[in-house]
């Protein structure tokens, strides 16, 4: 389906959201076949959006030379060119993208998830239930993949930029799919990628300090307020009772959502879980509401995944799906790089994407409970130029829970990975024999597995199935923790 945007529609949409300041040199009517913010993708007649910290006026000049008919910006850059001047160019891009694609989100059952940890796993619990109940693959946007009915593609952002996001919604409809489950990052709201998106369901999983830094959020309060926006932009709000700042989250949901459900571990919740039994693999647990009790089984390890599963059950029940389909859909979910357990000759390797305080804490506590007495080794690092407090938190947690730590590179960016490792080592503690710094991640994974003894557990944390490292502004190939572990174990 070909999409177009006329000047009258564009200006009307921007005025409706209070964004349009003026439209100098614009004729009465002007069709814009393409909409883009990439000067390299401009076609004749395009509307070009000047957005982003890296925008330079020469990008606009290139766009105009390539045939752009109009540009959108917060200030005039070219006095002769038609322009739509707006108060917030990122919001304007979201508004124009939705208008350009015909507001496809309004025709979807759109499920959005936010939280500091567990978004990806819960996304796939929900998706698998929907796939089972509906009898076909439903759409998903996650840190693992983007699937809208065509080919599944790798994702590099938790939540796509607004123009790509609206295209995903439109592609989903074009493939005859009516359900889409997606992760909604705090950055997605901060950068207005999901501005104006009407979610059918919004889930708030949990909250702890993360993504604080000069390139992300200036404070924890900013991080929290961005995540809170999902509760203000959904019809059904679902909240996990154990999250920090629960009362504020609940109040925001009650003020804006048509319906609010709470799930957790006690009977004060709308749905709660009890009677947890360890299985091999996974867990069986009982989900209760005021009128019923029902057993469910998951095969994923990690007790924290019971909370993720309960959230998925709460949402899909509220959407009217039968318990039998929910139980079948949730029973055998596996997410690449999330609690992937590999065992050989009495040795256990766990590949997990744990990368912040909340996820490391939950992972360590779960393993201590499910593998009592087993020595725990961990291989981990921290990314460059992002959330510097992670280095403190993860260092302290490794010092508290791990018997030995392999410190290595994890998307170092423009920083020296060895220096990041040395900084983390300073927080592990005074027992210097308990860690080693090996900046080459592939070599570190190989060595950690070679040194793993029967009865010991090794956590490969932070990268999961990702087959790249972010280095010096590039995506350098990396075999992935999961692939190296399988190779070294002969699996």
Describe the role of every protein-language-model region:
Residues 1-21, 44, 53-55, 131, ...:
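ATP-dependent carboxylate-amine ligase
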Residues 69-78, 142-145, 242-245, 265-266, ...:
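Short, polar loop motifs at secondary-structure junctions
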Residues 77-80, 175, 190, 200-349, ...:
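Acidic, Mg2+-coordinating active-site environments of NTP-dependent enzymes
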């Amino acid at each position: 389906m070909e999409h177009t945007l006329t000047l009258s529609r564009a200006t009307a949409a921007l005025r409706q959201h209070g964004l349009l300041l003026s439209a100098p040199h614009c004729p009465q009517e002007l069709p814009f076949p393409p909409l883009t913010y990439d000067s390299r993708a401009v076609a004749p007649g395009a509307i070009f959006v000047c957005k982003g910290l890296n925008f330079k006026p020469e990008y606009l000049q290139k766009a105009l030379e390539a045939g752009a008919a109009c540009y959108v910006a917060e200030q005039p850059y070219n006095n002769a060119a038609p322009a739509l001047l707006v108060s917030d160019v990122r919001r304007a891009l979201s508004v124009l993208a939705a208008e350009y694609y015909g507001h496809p989100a309004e025709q979807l059952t759109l499920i959005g998830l936010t939280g500091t940890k567990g978004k990806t796993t819960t996304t796939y619990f929900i998706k698998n239930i929907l796939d089972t109940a509906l009898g076909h693959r439903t759409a998903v946007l996650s840190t693992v993949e983007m699937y809208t009915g065509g080919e599944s593609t790798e994702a590099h952002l938790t939540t796509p930029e607004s123009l790509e996001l609206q295209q995903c919604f439109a592609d989903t409809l074009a493939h005859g799919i009516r359900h889409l489950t997606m992760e909604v990052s705090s950055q997605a709201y901060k950068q207005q990628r999901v501005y104006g998106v009407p979610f059918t369901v919004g889930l708030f999983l949990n909250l702890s300090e993360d993504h604080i830094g000069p390139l992300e959020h200036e404070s924890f309060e900013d991080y929290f307020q961005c995540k809170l926006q999902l509760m203000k932009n959904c019809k059904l709000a679902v909240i996990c009772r154990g999250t920090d700042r629960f009362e504020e989250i609940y109040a925001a949901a009650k003020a804006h959502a048509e319906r609010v459900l709470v799930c957790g571990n006690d009977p004060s919740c709308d749905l709660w879980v009890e009677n947890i039994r360890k299985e091999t693999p996974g867990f069986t647990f009982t989900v209760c509401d005021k009128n019923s009790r029902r057993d469910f089984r998951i095969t994923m390890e990690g007790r924290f995944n019971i909370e993720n599963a309960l959230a998925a059950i709460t949402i899909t029940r509220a959407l009217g799906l039968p318990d039998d389909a929910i139980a079948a859909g949730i029973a055998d979910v596996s997410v690449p790089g999330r609690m992937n357990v590999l065992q050989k000759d009495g040795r256990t390797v766990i590949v997990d994407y744990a990368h912040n305080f909340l996820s490391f804490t939950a992972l360590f506590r779960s393993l201590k409970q499910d593998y009592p007495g087993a020595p725990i080794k961990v291989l981990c690092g921290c990314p460059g130029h992002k959330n510097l407090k992670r280095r403190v938190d993860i260092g302290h947690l490794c010092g508290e829970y791990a018997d030995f730590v392999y410190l290595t590179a994890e998307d170092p960016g423009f920083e020296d990975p060895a220096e990041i490792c040395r900084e983390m080592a300073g927080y592990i503690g005074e027992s210097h024999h308990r860690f080693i710094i090996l900046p080459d991640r592939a070599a570190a994974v190989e060595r950690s597995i070679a040194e793993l003894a029967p009865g010991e557990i090794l956590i490969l944390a932070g990268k999961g199935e990702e087959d790249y490292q972010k280095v010096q502004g590039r995506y350098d190939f990396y075999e992935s923790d999961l692939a190296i572990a399988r190779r070294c174990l002969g699996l």
